Amino acid sequence: MKLIIGLGNPESRYNNTRHNIGFDLVDSLAAAFGSSFSSGKGKYLAAKITHRQETLMLIKPTTYMNLSGHAVVAAMNFHKVQKNDILVVCDDLNLPSGTMRLRAKGSAGGQNGLKHIIESLGSDEFARLRIGIRLGEMPPGSFSSFVLGKFSAEERVVMDRTLESCREAVLDFAKNGIEHAMNHYNKSAE
């Protein structure tokens, strides 16, 4: 079993925001496989899908982004999953919109959801899929207002295409592991 954890904020006012792209990805995977989310055994929602005989539990923390580690630990404990069987999906302000990066481990890179997961697990050795949300030069204003802002119509078209590739990358991770997925999908994103 693999846990695919999409990061985001739980309130509906955050739907379709850049910061919730992790939720968008797991929502699209659930929809593609005819699954739906229900309450998990902790502060998260879960949906189960099966792809090529591999079970994936799609997880959406119901904590805010900055407290995502609590939900990740609860889901890992309940499903008896180790760090090498999780993939955390989040936004990345440092990557251009429409790109993705898979990594086997690493720092939080300024992403507070990842930071809390690293703190909660006591390790940065878990796979992550970062989805770029930066639009060239940053618009004036705060980073938080940008990441919590909604996608424009043009951005949404780009992100929908990106989510297609991300879904394929997640399924590759589930079947073949992070190294295989990185070798295949990071090349096409560069």
Swiss-Prot record:
Keyword Secreted: no
GO cellular component: cytoplasm
Record-linked SUPFAM superfamilies: Peptidyl-tRNA hydrolase-like
InterPro entries noted in UniProt: Pept_tRNA_hydro (IPR001328), Pept_tRNA_hydro_CS (IPR018171), Pept_tRNA_hydro_sf (IPR036416)
Keyword tRNA-binding applies: yes
Any one GO molecular-function label of the UniProt entry: peptidyl-tRNA hydrolase activity
Positions of tRNA binding: Y14, Y64, N66, N112
Keyword annotations: Cytoplasm, Hydrolase, RNA-binding, tRNA-binding
Enzyme class: hydrolase
Documented EC number(s): 3.1.1.29
PROSITE patterns linked to this entry: PEPT_TRNA_HYDROL_1
Gene3D superfamilies listed in its UniProt record: Peptidyl-tRNA hydrolase
Family: Belongs to the PTH family.
Purpose of the protein: Hydrolyzes ribosome-free peptidyl-tRNAs (with 1 or more amino acids incorporated), which drop off the ribosome during protein synthesis, or as a result of ribosome stalling. Catalyzes the release of premature peptidyl moieties from peptidyl-tRNA molecules trapped in stalled 50S ribosomal subunits, and thus maintains levels of free tRNAs and 50S ribosomes.
Protein name: Peptidyl-tRNA hydrolase
Organism expressing this protein natively: Chlorobium luteolum (strain DSM 273 / BCRC 81028 / 2530)
Encoding gene per record: pth
